[in-house]
Amino acid sequence: MRIGIYPGTFDPITLGHIDVIKKSLKLVDKVIVATTYNINKEYFFTIDERIEIIKKSLFNDLKLNKKKIEIISFDTLTINLCKKYKAKIIIRGLRAVSDFEYEFQLAGMNRKLSSNIETIFLMSDVENQ
């Protein structure tokens, strides 16, 4: 089974995030949407609220397959999360060229930490950015 981890704060989840999730479902058998907490960042919603909003958006509103999507919170390195769930793919969304530099560096660091885990970049459709 091909498992992908889609990490982010999702505060709140957007149409762009949802578009990336839908596109990633065409590439992997299961997507783990992993929301995190950063003490250096202010949030609109708590972790529990974000998880509930994600569930409602994906399962109630869009009726996406619950067997293909898992929603979790995490407080570790994404690479550690990949190892825990046996995921070989990290899914990242790009909105603009300005996102690429940061994401490229992050992907390189993750590659050094675990060479068998790939990062893929997906762009949401223009109307969802």
Q: Locations of the language-model features?
A:
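Nucleotidyltransferase catalytic core that binds NTPs
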Residues: M1-Q129
